[in-house]
C-alpha cells in the first residue's frame, strides 16, 4: 500500500520536506520528513493519544496466546520502578506484532551468519547503529508457534559505519559517506569492490555486507584532498 502510505502519514501529523532538486535518483524514490525520526514518533504519539490509544512503557510482551492460529491474548511483563515485575494478560480481537527484528541478538546473529572460511564469526564484530533492545523475542516465539519463515536471515539494511562507533545506538552519524570518492581496501590492502559502481545513495546500504565478508570485518576508505568537504564528515576525531 505504498501509494497511500504518504497521505496516511500526513493525516497523522507527519510533515514532509519538498522534493530534492538536482538529484533525480533520490527525489523520485525517497520522501524525507521534517525533524527526523523523533518528530515522526512524536507526531504518531499525538495522533494516537487523540484516538484514545493507551501506551504502556517498560512493558514487554514475551508470549502470544493463539487458538488454532488466531490471536487470543498477549502476556505482558511490566517492569516497576522498585524492580519488581507485574504480569498482565491483554485480550483483543486482533493483534499487530510490530516488535522489530533480531539485529541486537548476538547469539541469533552468530547462528545466522555462522563461521567463515577463515574461522571467524563475522557477527561477533558487528556494531549495531540502532537500539540494543531488538532481540527478536516475539519473532522467535511466533516461529516456534508455527508462523511461516520467509527470506534469508542474513539479509539486512547493512551500511559501513565508523569502526570507532559505539556497540549500539550510534545512529546515522556513524555512517561512512566517503566510499564512492576514494579507494576502499581490507586489512590486507586489497580492493574488493567497485567503489563508484553507481550513484552513492543507491549503493551505501550494500557496504556493510561487503565489509563483513572481509578479514576481521574491517576496511579502510582512502581519499585525497580533493574529496574533503564533499561528504558528511565523521563525528569522531582523527583519521
Regions found by a protein language model. Give the residues of each.
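Short glycine-rich loop/turn motifs that provide flexible caps or phosphate-binding loops at active sites
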Residues: 36, 99-100, 181
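Generic structural signal for well-ordered, non-membrane alpha-helical segments
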Residues: 1-5, 33-41, 131-138, 177, ...
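Generic structural "secondary-structure junction" signal
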Residues: 18, 66, 104, 110-111, ...
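An anion/pyrophosphate-binding glycine-rich loop and adjacent beta-alpha core
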Residues: 139-141, 145-239
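Conserved redox-cofactor binding core of oxidoreductases
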Residues: 1-88, 92, 105-108, 160-163
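Glycine-rich loop(s) and the adjacent beta-strand/alpha-helix scaffold that form part
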Residues: 83-84, 89-165
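General beta-strand structural signal in soluble alpha/beta enzymes
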Residues: 9, 16-18, 55-57, 97-98, ...
Amino acid at each position: 500500500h505504498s501509494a497511500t502510505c504518504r497521505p496516511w502519514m500526513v493525516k497523522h501529523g507527519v510533515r514532509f520536506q519538498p522534493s530534492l532538486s538536482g538529484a533525480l535518483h533520490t527525489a523520485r524514490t525517497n520522501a524525507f520528513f521534517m525533524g527526523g525520526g523523533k518528530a515522526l514518533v512524536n507526531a504518531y504519539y499525538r495522533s494516537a493519544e487523540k484516538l484514545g490509544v493507551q501506551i504502556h512503557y517498560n512493558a514487554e510482551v514475551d508470549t502470544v496466546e493463539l487458538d488454532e492460529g488466531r490471536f487470543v491474548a498477549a502476556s505482558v511483563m511490566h517492569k516497576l520502578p522498585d524492580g519488581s515485575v507485574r504480569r498482565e494478560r491483554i485480550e483483543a480481537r486482533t493483534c499487530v506484532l510490530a516488535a522489530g527484528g533480531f539485529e541486537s541478538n548476538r547469539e541469533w546473529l552468530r547462528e545466522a551468519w555462522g563461521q567463515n572460511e577463515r574461522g571467524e564469526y563475522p557477527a561477533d564484530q558487528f556494531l549495531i547503529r540502532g537500539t540494543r533492545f531488538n532481540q527478536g523475542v516475539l519473532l522467535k516465539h511466533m516461529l516456534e508457534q508455527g508462523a511461516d519463515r520467509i527470506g534469508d536471515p542474513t539479509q539486512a539494511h547493512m551500511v559501513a559505519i565508523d569502526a570507532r562507533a559505539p556497540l549500539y545506538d550510534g545512529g546515522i552519524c556513524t555512517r561512512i559517506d566517503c566510499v564512492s570518492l576514494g579507494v576502499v581496501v581490507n586489512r590486507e590492502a586489497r580492493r574488493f569492490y567497485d567503489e563508484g559502481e553507481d550513484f552513492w545513495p543507491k549503493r551505501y546500504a550494500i557496504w556493510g555486507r561487503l565489509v563483513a565478508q572481509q578479514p576481521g570485518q574491517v576496511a579502510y576508505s582512502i581519499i585525497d584532498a580533493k574529496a574533503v568537504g564533499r561528504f558528511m564528515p565523521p563525528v569522531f576525531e582523527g583519521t
